[in-house]
């Protein structure tokens, strides 16, 4: 399994709301992520500036690149757009992170 990480940006004043929305994540979104080959997905928040650090594993042959085409993914992005930095299509702005250290 490949592990990837990326950074997103939350409005720092919306930390509690971001966590609440993820505590109530839609079952159909969870299913779409798993069906795309994603597992062990965690998001960490830096409360000082709203930086989000996400890390996940994806299986070989994953379908992660097809997620933006799924209606549930687009609905989730719209639901989160009021509290995050987003692209014109409401997807969160995300910057890939390069691993610089790993302790197996």
From Swiss-Prot:
One of its GO terms (cellular component) is cytoplasm. GO terms for molecular function: L-rhamnose mutarotase activity. It catalyses: alpha-L-rhamnose = beta-L-rhamnose. Pathway: Carbohydrate metabolism; L-rhamnose metabolism. Keywords: Carbohydrate metabolism, Cytoplasm, Isomerase, Rhamnose metabolism. It is found in: Cytoplasm. Pfam families: rhaM. Its EC number is 5.1.3.32. One of its GO terms (biological process) is rhamnose catabolic process. Substrate binds at residues 18, 41, 76-77. HAMAP family: L_rham_rotase. Homodimer. This is L-rhamnose mutarotase. It comes from Acidiphilium cryptum (strain JF-5).
């Amino acid at each position: 399994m490949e592990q990837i990480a990326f950074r997103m940006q939350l409005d720092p004043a919306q930390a509690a709301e971001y966590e609440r929305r993820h505590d109530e994540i839609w079952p159909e979104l969870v299913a779409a992520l798993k069906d795309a080959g994603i597992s062990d997905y965690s998001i960490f928040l830096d409360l000082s500036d709203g930086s989000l650090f996400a890390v996940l594993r994806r299986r070989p042959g994953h379908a992660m690149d097809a997620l933006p085409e799924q209606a549930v993914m687009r609905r989730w992005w719209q639901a989160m757009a009021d509290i995050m930095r987003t692209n014109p299509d409401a997807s969160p702005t995300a910057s890939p992170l390069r691993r610089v250290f790993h302790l197996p």
